[in-house]
Amino acid sequence: MSRIGKQPIPIPSGVEVKIGNDVVEVKGPKGALTTPVCSVLSYEVTDGKVVITRLDETRQTRAQHGLRRTLLANCIEGVSKGFSKTLEVVGVGYKVAVKGDVVDLSVGYSHPVLIDLPAGISAKAEGNKLTISGVDKELVGEVAAQMRRVRKPEPYKGKGIKYDNEQIRRKAGKSGGKK
């Protein structure tokens, strides 16, 4: 049996889980999320826990078991605590600002790069750090990756947009002397 899939998912107080025919709805203090139901799995809510079991033992079912359990656990954690990613802007003259639902990145181009935030995502800029937060883990990660792609960190000076905990592999510059 899947080591991840067989673990029950605890439901924190203030979070409500409803299992429908084709989606599982999760509501909590931070918002509401839905995740699709897999037809080869059985979902059950018992005494403050969600248990997912397999209906058969095919390879496809075993693969879906751990995946669907993790997706549902992320929904439950998202509506109770939320998720956030922190980006750091490194470089002389590089700036970041949040204006409503638009993030303004000035990262060495001749024009500022404006990125619209999708619904359910908020951003906060403090100095050279940008924190992206929301209830949907996948969407938070996607928006953070989209912003990082604007100016990836380069290996010589480390300039660019990087994740807060990311280590940039640095390269040595040219070492040849004049002739």
UniProtKB/Swiss-Prot annotation:
GO cellular component, as recorded: cytosolic large ribosomal subunit
InterPro entries in UniProt: Ribosomal_uL6-like, Ribosomal_uL6-like_a/b-dom_sf, Ribosomal_uL6_a/b-dom, Ribosomal_uL6_bac-type, Ribosomal_uL6_CS
Residue spans of biased composition, Basic and acidic residues class: 152-169
An example Gene Ontology molecular-function term: structural constituent of ribosome
Biased composition (Basic residues): 170-179
GO BP, one annotated term: cytoplasmic translation
Domain of life: Bacteria
Family annotation (PANTHER family): 60S/50S RIBOSOMAL PROTEIN L6/L9 (PTHR11655), LARGE RIBOSOMAL SUBUNIT PROTEIN UL6M (PTHR11655:SF14)
Quaternary structure note: Part of the 50S ribosomal subunit.
Protein name: Large ribosomal subunit protein uL6
Origin species: Nitratidesulfovibrio vulgaris (strain ATCC 29579 / DSM 644 / CCUG 34227 / NCIMB 8303 / VKM B-1760 / Hildenborough)
Recorded name of the encoding gene: rplF
